[in-house]
From Swiss-Prot:
It comes from Staphylococcus aureus (strain Mu3 / ATCC 700698). It holds the Pfam family tRNA-synt_1d. It is found in: Cytoplasm. GO terms for biological process: arginyl-tRNA aminoacylation. CDD domains: ArgRS_core. Monomer. The keyword Secreted does not apply. Its EC number is 6.1.1.19. Signal peptide: none annotated. This is Arginine--tRNA ligase. It catalyses: tRNA(Arg) + L-arginine + ATP = L-arginyl-tRNA(Arg) + AMP + diphosphate. Its main location: cytoplasm. InterPro entries: aa-tRNA-synth_I_CS (IPR001412), Arg-tRNA-ligase (IPR001278), Arg-tRNA-synth_N (IPR005148), Arg-tRNA-synth_N_sf (IPR036695), ArgRS_core (IPR035684), DALR_anticod-bd (IPR008909), Rossmann-like_a/b/a_fold (IPR014729), tRNAsynth_Ia_anticodon-bd (IPR009080).
Amino acid sequence: MNIIDQVKQTLVEEIAASINKAGLADEIPDIKIEVPKDTKNGDYATNIAMVLTKIAKRNPREIAQAIVDNLDTEKAHVKQIDIAGPGFINFYLDNQYLTAIIPEAIEKGDQFGHVNESKGQNVLLEYVSANPTGDLHIGHARNAAVGDALANILTAAGYNVTREYYINDAGNQITNLARSIETHFFEALGDNSYSMPEDGYNGKDIIEIGKDLAEKHPEIKDYSEEARLKEFRKLGVEYEMAKLKNDLAEFNTHFDNWFSETSLYEKGEILEVLAKMKELGYTYEADGATWLRTTDFKDDKDRVLIKNDGTYTYFLPDIAYHFDKVKRGNDILIDLFGADHHGYINRLKASLETFGVDSNRLEIQIMQMVRLMENGKEVKMSKRTGNAITLREIMDEVGVDAARYFLTMRSPDSHFDFDMELAKEQSQDNPVYYAQYAHARICSILKQAKEQGIEVTAANDFTTITNEKAIELLKKVADFEPTIESAAEHRSAHRITNYIQDLAAHFHKFYNAEKVLTDDIEKTKAHVAMIEAVRITLKNALAMVGVSAPESM
């Protein structure tokens, strides 16, 4: 239990003890305490006096006074109590309890903020999963940044997380990729008789694959059409995936599993789920096609599994894939989908229900669109290539840190304008610069302290920390673990980014209000330890969203 929860629990226990002591109730109702909207009204407040009115048959202000008179303020860490309005009790805490967070942060280091106890739940988090048919773009970048941050947050909160990328290496898009490579392969050999498929890929990278294969493997031209296309499928996917993996690694995004769609066919899992759904009575034949009764499970219409030409829809392998996730022992399945996949939510959930799997175990987050902005105008095409702007170009333009930070600043279900000019600014208007500068500033102060012979130690007299800005800063440090737990519970990576901004702001305010290094050696030691706790917290929080914490800027 974190220090904030400990103090809240102690306060509730002491309020209950006070009610007993005052003889106000034989059975005490739930005591709810909350943080007042206005900090002038204390650190915590409760309406328990009004709740007890009918039980105690007394005026709520009288009840409130009886609670105040019988409260052990020392145990409750309370220095002042006010009774407000009809009977609200406002508590002002003796904030010295907050200084306990300093040695805790220093001792735990890069594990500070992490929940020690495992929640005992396995989470499979699938994100990015872009088709291996071209470069990653800004939508994939948001998916990667949010997905990787969410994996870090869930891990810190005690979940067992597996990060997975689903490789769409089967189906029509890969056939079109192979046909496109075939066209460019023969063009490079001087044969223009192979036309591009209607939905073919004509990007520069696909042209380069064709040329490269013509140069290195001209013998492919003599293969049968079936063997040739099989080779182009394999080599095309390998080439594209190698490029995607390289870009994602540079974007500080890593995966535990790369799951191939083709493996579902090879292992017979698609036929297995199809047979199982038929056996359970959830499929039927109509118009020459095979359908799944997803309307039995709140979908708006039934879905086709096998088309009337005998080919599978995309839905069937997706069902097999998600059932495979369940079979692997995962308790929670989280998918991050692009905005164009919104209609997939109900049908996927319905498909799990056909197997008796609680569809609430599947959580789908929809990533809304990102617009790249420059000088107030949307930038749709690359100035260099004339094509859609790629993840690599974004990394080259603004850097990995800025891209990761900006893409996790907003809830993924909201549209986001990515201001590339702001992301490059070295000013406090740039959110990532503002946060990283706070870390670098602390490192500079710690270096000065060391030069003066003052080492960071968790064993200090922290009673010298009385400045209001210092107390507010410590409150923010103490709020790190609750923020992680909240971000994990709500699957909200942007809560960490918001926290980083607040923590950096509180540090800058403290820095501007009070000198860290003073002639008072005991106070200086306490302040040095405190800002080390802040530095650790900042670094850990930045790491959660995949951003570095530089020691100098």
